[in-house]
UniProtKB/Swiss-Prot annotation:
Zn(2+) binds at residues 562, 566, 664, 668. Its cofactor is Zn(2+). It comes from Buchnera aphidicola subsp. Schizaphis graminum (strain Sg). It is an enzyme of class 6 (ligase). This is Alanine--tRNA ligase. Binds 1 zinc ion per subunit. It catalyses: tRNA(Ala) + L-alanine + ATP = L-alanyl-tRNA(Ala) + AMP + diphosphate. Belongs to the class-II aminoacyl-tRNA synthetase family. PANTHER family: ALANINE--TRNA LIGASE, CYTOPLASMIC, ALANYL-TRNA SYNTHETASE. It is found in: Cytoplasm.
């Protein structure tokens, strides 16, 4: 009986557990402390620091099943997914690792035993072929003499392009660093194929199933390597590939987990061919999307969020392609969790969040997908040179949310190319327009570059004696400044906190003798701190000894809001769930703003619950403790950290009893009671899946409540009732207004009927075509539209133009029946009005509207329009019209 994929995964772990390996869980898809990777793409990623010698080994032998994602860079698998047998965005990598424990002989022996022994995978030995690095004679002999592989089943692979160590069988982490030869195990699907030159032939019958890397050298340069004292083993075997082998299928998409998913997707369509490319793409993409969202990545227009959005939209487009009309993608999540078995633990915890996130993204994109596809298909039909312009591709990207690779995917199916250069030019032009639009002033100080440091003493001191090291006016270094000059001053040490981590910079003053410099803002410049402000008396010279003194009241207000921000983050996670994760913040002296991930709606009851939790912590007057810990210690204490932030090995951790633990470099109040009061003043949605809360604390919160009290008093006065009766009084007023609106509507309908009868007498009949032009004065626009639409229904062949005069301008509504639009259109008529009366407007062939027309030109335009339309109608033959 064939093993299931879930059984194969567990068998691998059980085997290496018997070989005294410690089973280590899969690390996050988001690499920790590794800015070189967007996503975890190999089993060794979580052990990179051990291979580099940056960390001491924790276990000599470990084994893992690592979740991996490959969508860009060297491993750009996205465009190949579904079209090949073995490309995936998400996959599971089986691996065993040794850190200065066993080496080549044991690693090869273990691999062979697992693959071929009856107890384990029981693969026919004759179907396995081996590649080794040509200079790695030791490995070759282990395969030949110990494992007893026939020589014609072992292939030596040399370097490419005569470049030493540049080989498929020589692994390296980078241009320098740990490296070593590797040996690969291949499975031959074809019994008749006996070629020992299978790699050069690119023979599809041979599939690489396991790569064993021997990390035994340190690369010093392109041509020089030296032996490592501590040698390691790094292996990788794709779960999907080995499952295909053990289930005797020649494509990863034929294994049990994919077949179940594909079958589920096909239930949404009339397609029963499970080899359909779109079905395979959707099956692959639901896996990567679900696991990314489970890792707290949400769809957005940048960084990892945009990768997720691209994958989702690619899947949705393929759903559309195979005829799925309704939202379907999010409905696959429960089936995915059931199918994935043990590896779906993280998905089970986040099931509702994953579903909700996918549903929102699907609804949003479905609103633009059809329109975008119509435009793209029209451009493809028009294309004479088999190329879509960069401007069109960018228009689809910018207006309809089509990622460029999605447009490319559609075009490649029809052998159409994209002008990527033109796309990038259009994208850059848009960036420039945006930057010009948002640039209200030039920040000259951003160009200041100083290769120096400044000691920050502001955690403990409000005042510091300092030395002036540099002075800049705009971006130019100067030796001194005089009264009235604005500058940025750099000191050797300071008590001023620089703008950082969402907290605004301190204000205050720098002074000595008769010189006084008012600091208006403080910013970081590399490892130093700039004090921006204006000298109001005396002069300041480089190397002057001065005092730096912060505005204590200003700092204190900031500290209250910063500590309150930590309370808010913790309260949000208690009320909304652990997926409410910080995405941005602003901590100022007047208020705080907090952006966080959350895909659902937040109701008033939840807001009040959050406020109650925070104010309860404020009343408990807990001590706020700050400790400097190693990053490892902080993680053990489950301190909250920002995913994309690069932390040092030593970090500052803020503890608010057992309620909140966060990594933070900002300033805080000593006790929660100092905050006094916390009040949320605004809750909004910043973008898809990102919410924002704004709040005030202390005196600002009291002032806010006073304003609300004043508003209530004013409303009470206007309604002539007590505060407690306001809601009841407003309900009565609403009922009265609704009754009056009904009466008004009835009167308006009567007025409309009267107007229709009156206007019917003004119709001109030209060769069987009804022409009606009428001018109203300050008439209800909604009623005008109702009248014109009713007349259009009654007058089967007609052109109707309504003009509504106001004090300084006039508006125009035009309707033309469908049987006339081949001769005269509403759009053509409105364009005459726009051109001659300097107005604005637009429309379609049957319907057009405009406004802002110059009223002085109305008589002249009416005469012109009447004569122009009459001439057009005189030339029309009406015998073919359908009355």
């Amino acid at each position: 009986m064939k093993k299931t994929t879930n059984e194969i995964r567990q068998s691998f772990l059980n085997f290496f557990k018997e070989k005294e390996h410690v089973i280590v869980p899969s690390s996050s898809l988001i690499p920790e402390n590794d800015s070189t990777l967007l996503f975890t793409n190999a089993g060794m990623n979580q052990f990179k620091e051990y291979f580099l010698g940056q960390k001491k080994k924790f276990y000599p032998r470990v084994t893992t099943v690592q979740n991996c994602l490959r969508t860009g860079g060297k491993h750009n698998d996205l465009e190949n997914v579904g079209y090949t047998k073995r490309h995936h965005t998400f996959f599971e990598m089986l691996g065993n690792f040794s850190f200065n424990d066993y080496f080549k002989k044991e690693a090869i022996t273990y691999a062979w035993e697992l693959l071929t022994s009856r107890k384990w995978f029981n693969i026919d030995k004759n179907k396995l072929w081996i590649s080794v690095y040509e200079d790695d004679e030791e490995t070759y002999k282990i395969w030949r003499d110990i494992i007893r592989i026939p020589c014609h089943h072992i292939v030596k692979i040399g370097s490419k392009n005569n470049s030493q160590y540049d080989s498929e069988n020589f692994w390296q982490m980078g241009e320098t660093g740990p490296c070593g030869p590797c040996t690969e195990i291949f499975y031959n699907y074809d019994d008749s194929n006996k070629s020992n030159d299978f790699l050069k032939d690119k023979n599809e019958s041979f599939i690489e199933i396991w790569n064993i890397v021997f990390i035994e050298f340190n690369r010093i340069s392109k041509t020089k390597i030296v032996p490592l004292i501590n040698k390691s083993i790094d292996t990788g075997m794709g779960l999907e590939r080995i499952s295909a082998v053990l289930q005797n299928v020649h494509s990863n998409y034929k294994i049990d987990i994919f077949q179940k998913l594909i079958q589920k997707i096909s239930n949404f369509t009339e397609i029963k061919d499970l080899n359909n490319i779109s079905l395979k793409i959707i099956a692959d993409h639901i896996r990567s999307c679900a696991f990314l969202i489970a890792e707290n990545i949400l769809p957005s227009n940048e960084h990892r969020g945009y990768v997720l959005r691209r994958i989702i939209r690619r899947a949705l487009r393929h759903g559309h392609k195979i005829g799925i009309k309704n939202n379907f993608f999010y409905k696959l999540v429960p089936s995915l969790i059931e199918i994935m078995g043990d590896s779906a633990k993280i998905l089970r915890k986040k099931e509702k969040i994953i579903e909700e996130t996918l549903k929102i993204e699907e609804i949003q994109f479905s609103q633009t997908l059809d329109k975008g596809l119509k435009i793209l298909n029209a451009e493809i039909k028009k294309s004479t040179n088999k190329t879509i312009s960069g401007k069109t591709a960018f228009y689809l990207y910018d207006t309809f949310g089509f990622p460029i690779d999605l447009t490319s995917d559609i075009c490649s199916e029809k052998n159409i190319k994209i002008d990527f250069k033109g796309f990038n030019i259009a994208k850059e032009e848009q960036k420039k327009r945006s930057s010009i639009k948002n640039k209200f002033y030039k920040d000259y100080n951003k160009d200041i570059i100083i290769n120096d440091t400044c000691i920050f003493e502001g955690y403990k001191k409000n005042k510091t004696k300092s030395l002036v090291k540099y002075i800049f006016i705009k971006n130019e270094s100067v030796f001194l400044i005089y009264k009235g000059q604005t500058a940025t001053i750099f000191l050797d040490k300071t008590s001023f906190y620089p703008e950082s981590g969402g907290q605004i910079g301190d204000i205050g003053e720098l002074y000595h003798k008769k010189s006084r410099f008012i600091v208006e803002n403080t910013k970081k410049y590399g490892d130093t701190i700039g004090h921006y402000g204006k000298l109001i008396s005396g002069k300041i010279i480089v190397n002057d000894s001065i005092y730096s003194k912060i505005n204590h009241v200003y700092r204190n207000a900031i500290q209250l809001n910063h500590s309150a921000t930590h309370l808010l983050h913790a309260a949000l996670q208690k009320v909304l769930g652990k997926n409410a994760i910080q995405k941005g913040s602003l901590v100022s002296n007047t208020h705080l703003r907090f952006d966080f991930s959350y895909s659902g709606n937040i109701n008033l009851s939840q807001i009040q619950n959050i406020e109650n939790i925070i104010n309860k912590k404020i009343r408990s007057n807990d001590l706020i403790k700050i400790k400097n810990l190693s990053l490892e210690e902080a993680k053990k204490k489950k301190a909250i950290a920002l995913f994309d932030y690069k932390y040092q090995s030593s970090v500052r951790v803020v503890f608010i009893k057992d309620f909140s633990i966060e990594l933070c470099g900002g300033t805080h109040t000593k006790r929660t009671g100092n905050i006094g009061l916390f009040k949320i003043i605004e809750q909004s949605s910043v973008s898809s899946g990102i919410k924002r809360i704004e709040a005030v604390t202390g005196q600002q919160a009291i002032d806010y409540l006073h304003i609300k009290d004043n508003d209530m008093q004013n409303i009470s006065f206007l309604l002539k009732c007590q505060n407690s009766k306001i809601t009841e009084k407003i309900k009565k007023i609403i009922i009265q207004v609704e009754k009056l609106e009904k009466k008004t509507d009835q009167l308006q309908k009567r007025e409309n009927i009267y107007q229709i009868k009156k206007l019917s007498k003004k119709i001109n009949n030209i060769k069987g075509i009804n022409l009606l032009i009428n001018t109203f004065t300050n008439y209800d626009q909604k009623s005008m539209k109702m009248i014109i639409d009713q007349l259009k229904k009654e007058l089967k062949i007609s052109i109707i133009i309504f003009i509504n005069k106001n004090k300084n301008d006039f508006t125009v509504i035009i309707r033309v029946t469908k049987n006339l639009i081949n001769y005269i259109t509403a759009l053509k008529i409105i364009n005459i009005f726009i051109k001659k009366a300097n107005g604005k407007g637009g429309g379609k062939k049957e319907i057009a509207e405009g406004g802002g027309m110059n009223i002085k030109k109305l008589p002249m335009i009416l005469n012109y329009i009447k004569s122009w339309i009459t001439i057009q109608l005189e030339n029309i033959k009406t015998k073919n019209f359908n009355n």
